[in-house]
Amino acid sequence: MSNTRERISRGGISLLWALAGIVLIAIMWELTKILGTLIELPFNTSDQAMPNIWSMFSAFTLPEVRGSDTSVFQAVLAAASYSLLLAMGGFFIGVVVGLILAIVMQRFLFFERGLLPFVIASQTVPLIALAPLIVGIGNQISFGPIQWSTTYSVMFIAAYLAFFPLSIGALRGLQAPDPTSLELMRSYAATNNSILWKLRFPASIPYLVPALKVSAAAAVVGTVVAEISTGVRGGIGRLMIEYARETTSQPAKVYVAVFGAIALGLVVAAIIAAIDVLLTRNLPKKGLA
């Protein structure tokens, strides 16, 4: 319990530092705009390119479309919520696939030697080229009455980016137990499944938690980029493109969508932080290092 409280306390301190960093960025933003009026800078600091911080926040209350009852804030909140569902769906699929691959590669050495190079090579494919390919293939797929949609393509791309760090981290964690512990389990006639669940998985937690964080971040990035690439509507990625078209008349509006994407990432990070506390609450401090 004390270990959990200590981790929560450290998390609170980290949050305060993060808030201080946000305030510092806002101050530097405004100082840069002021400096741009005094001397010539190598980039544009006009209100068209760099709106004031208060202009960005006032854009939250603007109607999304002239005459509409829906505010920009409501539209961004709905889009971020939709993207969150897609990102978490892709993240879950990526975690399951990554864990299965890690277990198979740990259990069978020839699979590790054969699969690992392909797992690594899979991440060298440019996402911008992969998205249209997945959409094109997906349009030919149907499961009875269920037709593949671009929503599934977005989740697939998110899972594609999420599975790699999880599979590598899980594989390293499953291989972490020292030979003495493995020999002790085998001396008790423990089966491979017993060793997996009672020794390898607990030993892999310090490796799994960082891998989960990277996978979650990759799933969010994959979701936003896939929404832009595939043109799926309703998500924060597509909303940023739509608001970017209005930069001439409302330059601050696009930043509201960017704030929505940032908030999406922070929510996912908070979810993973809660999972982190849950998984590591009983680990000794040495295991958390």
Explain the meaning of each model-derived region.
Residues 236-276:
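Hydrophobic alpha-helical transmembrane segments of polytopic membrane proteins
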Residues 31-38, 99, 103, 110-117, ...:
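Membrane-spanning helices that line or support transport/gating and their immediate boundary helices
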Residues 193-226, 256:
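Transmembrane alpha-helices
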Residues 37-92:
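Periplasmic/extracellular loop-to-transmembrane helix junction in inner-membrane transport proteins
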Residues 1-23, 270-289:
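Transmembrane alpha-helical segments of polytopic membrane transport and secretion proteins
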Residues 120-165, 172-173:
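Generic hydrophobic transmembrane alpha-helix motif, especially the helices
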Residues 169-208:
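Short cytoplasmic-facing helical segments at TM-TM junctions of multi-pass membrane proteins
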Residues 86-119, 140:
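Transmembrane-helix boundary motif in ABC transporter permease subunits
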